[in-house]
Amino acid sequence: MELITILEKTVSPDRLELEAAQKFLERAAVENLPTFLVELSRVLANPGNSQVARVAAGLQIKNSLTSKDPDIKAQYQQRWLAIDANARREVKNYVLQTLGTETYRPSSASQCVAGIACAEIPVNQWPELIPQLVANVTNPNSTEHMKESTLEAIGYICQDIDPEQLQDKSNEILTAIIQGMRKEEPSNNVKLAATNALLNSLEFTKANFDKESERHFIMQVVCEATQCPDTRVRVAALQNLVKIMSLYYQYMETYMGPALFAITIEAMKSDIDEVALQGIEFWSNVCDEEMDLAIEASEAAEQGRPPEHTSKFYAKGALQYLVPILTQTLTKQDENDDDDDWNPCKAAGVCLMLLATCCEDDIVPHVLPFIKEHIKNPDWRYRDAAVMAFGCILEGPEPSQLKPLVIQAMPTLIELMKDPSVVVRDTAAWTVGRICELLPEAAINDVYLAPLLQCLIEGLSAEPRVASNVCWAFSSLAEAAYEAADVADDQEEPATYCLSSSFELIVQKLLETTDRPDGHQNNLRSSAYESLMEIVKNSAKDCYPAVQKTTLVIMERLQQVLQMESHIQSTSDRIQFNDLQSLLCATLQNVLRKVQHQDALQISDVVMASLLRMFQSTAGSGGVQEDALMAVSTLVEVLGGEFLKYMEAFKPFLGIGLKNYAEYQVCLAAVGLVGDLCRALQSNIIPFCDEVMQLLLENLGNENVHRSVKPQILSVFGDIALAIGGEFKKYLEVVLNTLQQASQAQVDKSDYDMVDYLNELRESCLEAYTGIVQGLKGDQENVHPDVMLVQPRVEFILSFIDHIAGDEDHTDGVVACAAGLIGDLCTAFGKDVLKLVEARPMIHELLTEGRRSKTNKAKTLATWATKELRKLKNQA
């Protein structure tokens, strides 16, 4: 009884009662989990107990079996499997008995069954479960509640378990699901549970989709369910079609004409948002699939082979029907629309963009009449839809086809930036931004640039949602203007460009925008800072005085922000404060990159003092630490060897960054900075190396360090060796052993992420070896004898390269590094290398691949390495 009372108190409005109940349950779980779970399952299984107690008991069981965090979930599953088999059997019997006895939804028992199943099925336990669940659904005497909760359990299992674990059960599971979906099933609740279960099972029913008769049957049942009068079932059935289209595109031709086309077009026209959304999503998915198929076709053509799968061009064929519905849907905006609400109007915009990318030129004649007819419509909804449609089709069709249309539309768009409706102004600003990004020649022409700049500068004072889009337009415009400027051959940046005359005003207005009191709305503040960064980055020489001024403003702001820290009261203040620090650091990086060396020397003391203050105050915020480390990196780049005077003061914070592996982005930034310091300070970094090397080696040996940090550390060993030359000898043995271990790493080849990671790891090992060989051999004509310390490892290094050559997943980056290292080994060790390479013909194939590579680095290094090998051959 006591347990029931306590479970009922888990929903108590009295906070003390509630906390006491939670503490009791936590203690019970720790003291004796098996007994506790058996007791809970007893409470759950007894229909005489209150609904509150049963739901709470189910929740406790479920939460002891599963978690959103995959690592914790795996621990819980192991903990469950370690419980005595009798106790587990008792819990399983009780939760199975509960199915069908609950009068509330969703069923708690179904979640418990799924939690246990996901732990036991992968280790071949509980074999009787799936047959039992199938029997519950197919037994003609089962109640509605029994069928519904059982199908929910099946759905949860399918959702959470690795599809491979259920492959051999797919027929039975599918039988139960289809049974619940049939149009003869009287209960819509059962139909809904079955349709949701099907949605979760589609990944592992591939064998059933491969068989024509079974596929016909599944498709028939799903299509019938899309006509169910219950909206919930209709939406779930449409979700199935959306997913089937992605998974089984190749099989859809039979169903497209007779069924899918009509069903989805009808759904798109529905007044019920959820239904319309699925209809639109279906065609967005068709576009995604057909774009992938287009890429596959062009790759196959390049390699002179037929593609594995071909596109049926459904999107192109449906344009004339889809576009009118989508443009009509664009007119259903909500005036005070919240950015986060996904609705048919937004989905229609995305679908139009995908259609434009997928069907290219073919879409223009279908959309143009709507734009022309409504861009000056007195009803703001139609004006907005016309501008939106125009913005959506700018990417995909040939620029040459769009350019005359855009130039013709420019005066109207500039006018619409001052429209009485804020929605129209917002969309017009977005469309102008898209034009600046995708068809900049239309924006930077002599006729429209001046009026466009005028209207954009005014737009910065508009509502946050409009101003935010204007900021983005400025970013794209600056980049386009910079690329279009004339550059003298020997110069890196143009002397002047088309934004020069308005540059100072634009920068001033953007700085004012970053200070707007409503800057936290619609990301306006960060958009304005990002725009400022782009404009400074893409500025011509004659804008330099304005860049100098901006640098001083940013430095002043950084100091002001650091003084505000003591006044922070609330968490939301702290978040805004941290965001502002990060934005200022990022902006500082961009202005520093533009500042000339002698100017940088004048301001570096103040900049460094601010950054050091930031490190002292932000011990708690990883994001800010990361941005501050990146800003130091930029200062190091700009100052070069002159940075040495700050090293003593900065050293402790570099150490803190390297130790902060819990926030691995911070650690990555610190490791990257070590590389920059090596390049800038060269041998002057020697006094700091012992400490840095110790921290780097500790991180490599610590399994809690995020895996992405490790390749960067290996690569930085090469930077250190290159900087300190012979002084690296004292670290050589331990580093070479570490590299030998790392270069033998193996991963699961079916996991693409791990294949990428392996390439990263290998590239870093090669970079490290390269730095060590170059550092020890020195840059004099005669090779320094120190390099002979590496000689015993040369054969291993070449075997490693040979192993890479034989792995077809290697990247261009790996090929480039391997080729560079081969060349360095030739110059350091001479004819010994030749013998070892000759014995490994795969290495020659790797160099041939490098010489034919499309990336410059691989081509250059492979050609050089081949020449070095040839030299040795001629000497021999």
UniProtKB/Swiss-Prot annotation:
Give a GO molecular function annotation for the protein: nuclear import signal receptor activity
Repeat is among the record's keywords: yes
Annotated InterPro entries: ARM-like, ARM-type_fold, Armadillo, HEAT_type_2, Importin-beta_N, Importin_beta
Question: Its Gene Ontology biological processes?
Answer: astral microtubule organization; establishment of mitotic spindle localization; mitotic chromosome movement towards spindle pole; mitotic metaphase chromosome alignment; mitotic spindle assembly; NLS-bearing protein import into nucleus; positive regulation of cholesterol biosynthetic process; protein import into nucleus
Q: Which Pfam families match?
A: HEAT_EZ, IBN_N
Ranges: HEAT repeats: 2-31, 33-65, 85-123, 129-160, 170-202, 212-247, 253-302, 314-360, 364-394, 402-438, 449-485, 500-537, 544-592, 600-639, 644-681, 686-724, 732-776, 786-829, 831-873
Q: Where is this region: Ran-GTP binding?
A: 334-419
Kindly list the positions at which N-acetylmethionine occurs in this protein. 1
Modified-residue entries (N6-acetyllysine), positions: 211, 835, 867
- Keyword terms, alphabetized: Acetylation, ADP-ribosylation, Cytoplasm, Host-virus interaction, Nucleus, Phosphoprotein, Protein transport, Repeat, Transport
Question: Where in or outside the cell?
Answer: Cytoplasm; Nucleus envelope
Please list where the region (IAB-binding) is annotated. Answer: 329-342
Query: What protein does this entry describe?
Result: Importin subunit beta-1
Name the source organism: Homo sapiens (Human)
Q: Which gene encodes it?
A: KPNB1
